[in-house]
């Protein structure tokens, strides 16, 4: 089955072609970072308009790269949520229009299920069951995964997601958008031990997260430095390192608890923050200490992309899941509501 995947949940237009027998054939992405950087964050209306501009050229591009023609496509998968409604509607409308014109099925895919399954595109995919850490700009969740659509939420953030905390903290200390990669870059030059951040909610049982306090702690620390006349680049580096260490250690502690609670030794990390090198190294060390394994996608498939949507949609289509031509998207969509395969 040859599936065209469309991703438009936020500020990246992703298109890919995935074949159930041959694997990923082509993948293309246009990032709107430069468009939104001047505003310090994503402007939904601008995001939607740019998706409209980019979608069809990217579809033509992946068809050319794969050496395919439209008549060879068996189905279309598109992101139906969660995400920005306007942006989602662009992808959904395009998918359903093409599906109608080509007389093929289209299926809406859950954005975070796409992220969760992205490591399946790698040479050494994880076997079920496993624990998944979904960590992005909008989500921080620990999920037990027994199969596609078989999800048990173990814990999640009670306020800011980890990626959101990265971006907001970066903005508070004067870094460019997107803030997560900027903090990671500066942290490499930071001096450890100068600042010590708390590890929120690690001193109590449970698998919930809270990152809003770290953002406030960073703001107060930065203001104290500025008031003392020390707002140097090195101070930003040291602050970035301390913040990153706090987030990474907090996530690692919670992941270890989740593995112990479930009795599992396989961990998948997915979502934009899973590309963070410090987080990967910390989780690899932790899994090594318990003789377990950690799995993640290559960096280009950690951020939003069409390949993960094409793959996830393909699995559901092969299992016989169907959908009518109604255009329906959801800004919020609990992953536990998805039907199991």
From Swiss-Prot:
Subcellular location(s) of the protein: Cytoplasm
Disulfide bonds: none
Binding annotation for Fe cation: 111, 115, 304
CDD domains: ASKHA_NBD_TsaD_bac
Cofactor note: Binds 1 Fe(2+) ion per subunit.
Alphabetical list of Gene3D superfamilies matching this protein: 3.30.420.40
Annotated residues for binding of substrate: 134-138, 167, 180, 276
Pfam families in alphabetical order: TsaD
Keyword check for DNA repair: no
Family from the record: Belongs to the KAE1 / TsaD family.
Name of the protein: tRNA N6-adenosine threonylcarbamoyltransferase
Native source species: Pseudomonas putida (strain ATCC 700007 / DSM 6899 / JCM 31910 / BCRC 17059 / LMG 24140 / F1)
Lineage of source species: Bacteria, Pseudomonadati, Pseudomonadota, Gammaproteobacteria, Pseudomonadales
Gene from which this protein is expressed: tsaD
């Amino acid at each position: 089955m040859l599936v065209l995947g469309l991703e438009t949940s936020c500020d990246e237009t992703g298109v890919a072609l995935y074949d159930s027998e041959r694997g990923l054939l082509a993948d293309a992405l246009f990032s709107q970072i430069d468009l939104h950087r001047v505003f310090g964050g994503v402007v939904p209306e601008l995001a939607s308009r740019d998706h409209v501009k980019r979608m069809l050229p990217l579809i033509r591009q992946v068809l050319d790269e794969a050496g395919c023609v439209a008549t060879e496509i068996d189905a279309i998968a598109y992101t139906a949520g969660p995400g920005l409604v306007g942006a989602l509607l662009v992808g959904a409308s395009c998918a359903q229009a093409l599906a109608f014109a080509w007389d093929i099925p289209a299926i809406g895919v859950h954005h975070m299920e796409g992220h969760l399954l992205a490591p399946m595109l790698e040479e050494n995919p994880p076997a079920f069951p496993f624990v998944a850490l979904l960590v992005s700009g909008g989500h921080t969740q620990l999920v037990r995964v027994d199969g596609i659509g078989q999800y048990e939420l173990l814990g999640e953030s009670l306020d800011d997601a980890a990626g959101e905390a990265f971006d907001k903290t970066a903005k508070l200390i004067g870094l460019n958008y997107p803030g997560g990669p900027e903090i990671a870059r500066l942290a490499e030059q930071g001096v450890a031990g100068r600042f010590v951040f708390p590890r929120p909610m690690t001193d109590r049982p449970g698998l919930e997260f809270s990152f809003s306090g770290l953002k406030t702690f960073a703001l107060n620390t930065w203001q104290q430095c500025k008031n003392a006349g020390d707002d140097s680049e090195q101070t930003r580096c040291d602050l970035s390192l301390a913040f990153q260490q706090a987030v990474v250690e907090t996530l690692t502690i919670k992941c270890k608890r989740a593995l112990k609670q479930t009795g599992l030794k396989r961990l998948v990390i997915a979502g934009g923050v899973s590309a963070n090198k410090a987080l990967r190294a910390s989780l690899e060390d932790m899994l090594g200490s318990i003789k377990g394994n950690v799995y993640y996608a290559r960096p280009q498939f950690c951020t939003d992309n069409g390949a993960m949507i094409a793959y996830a949609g393909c699995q559901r289509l092969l299992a016989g899941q169907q959908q009518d031509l109604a255009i329906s998207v959801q800004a919020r969509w609990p992953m536990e509501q998805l039907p199991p395969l």
